[in-house]
A protein has these predicted regions:
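Acidic-and-aromatic substrate-binding clefts and catalytic sites of carbohydrate-active enzymes
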Residues: 29-32, 58-60
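Anionic group-transfer/hydrolysis microenvironments
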Residues: 26, 39, 53
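Active-site beta-strand-loop-beta-strand hairpin of nuclease catalytic cores
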Residues: 31-49
Length: 160
C-alpha cells in the first residue's frame, strides 16, 4: 500500500472533504518547517496533521523527529499506517498522545481500502487558544494553488 493510498483512505473515511478543509503536501504556506502529508481543518478550527508511513523503518525514523514538541499550527497528529504496521505505530504513538489510523489494502470492489481508527490522539497544544477564523479559507486556498500547480506541471495527456 502506497503512502498516498493510505492518506486517501484515511481522508475519505475520517476527514471527508465536504465537512473538512483538507490539503495534502502542506508546508510553508501553513507555517510548518517540514512538509505534512495532509492537513485537515474542522469547522471548529481544529487542525489535524496526517502522516502516512508504509515501512517500519520510516515510522521509527519519523517518530524520532521533534516536530510535535512545538505544535504551533497543529492540534492533533495522526499516523496513517497499513494494518501490518498497526501494533508498532500504536506502541510509538500512545506515550506521546498521537493518533493512529490503520488502513487495509483495497479489495476487489474497494478502490481505497478500509480504514479503522484505532487510537485517538490527545491535543498537542492548549485547546483554549483562539484560532484565527481565516484558517479554513487559507487551507482551501493552499489546496487550490496546489491543485493547479500540479495540473500545470503534469505533462499533457497524463492522468492521475
Amino acid at each position: 500500500v502506497t503512502e498516498s493510498a493510505l492518506i486517501l483512505a484515511a481522508v475519505w473515511k475520517w476527514f471527508p472533504p465536504r465537512r473538512w478543509a483538507v490539503c495534502d503536501g502542506v508546508s510553508y504556506g501553513w507555517g510548518l518547517l517540514y512538509e505534512a502529508d495532509a492537513i485537515a481543518v474542522s469547522k471548529a478550527g481544529r487542525v489535524h496533521e496526517l502522516e502516512a508511513k508504509s515501512a517500519k523503518a520510516d515510522l521509527a525514523r519519523d517518530h524520532k523527529k521533534r516536530k510535535w514538541l512545538l505544535p504551533a499550527q497543529v492540534d492533533y497528529f495522526w499516523y496513517v499506517v497499513p494494518t501490518a504496521l498497526t501494533d508498532p505505530a500504536v506502541a510509538l504513538a500512545r506515550p506521546r498522545g498521537l493518533g493512529v489510523i490503520s488502513v487495509s489494502a483495497p479489495g476487489a470492489n474497494d478502490v481505497i481500502g478500509n480504514s479503522v481508527r484505532l487510537l485517538l490522539p490527545k491535543p498537542l497544544r492548549s485547546q483554549n487558544r483562539v484560532r484565527d477564523r481565516s484558517d479554513r479559507p487559507r487551507l482551501w486556498r493552499l489546496a487550490a494553488v496546489r491543485y493547479w500547480d500540479e495540473r500545470i506541471r503534469k505533462p499533457k495527456g497524463e492522468t492521475r
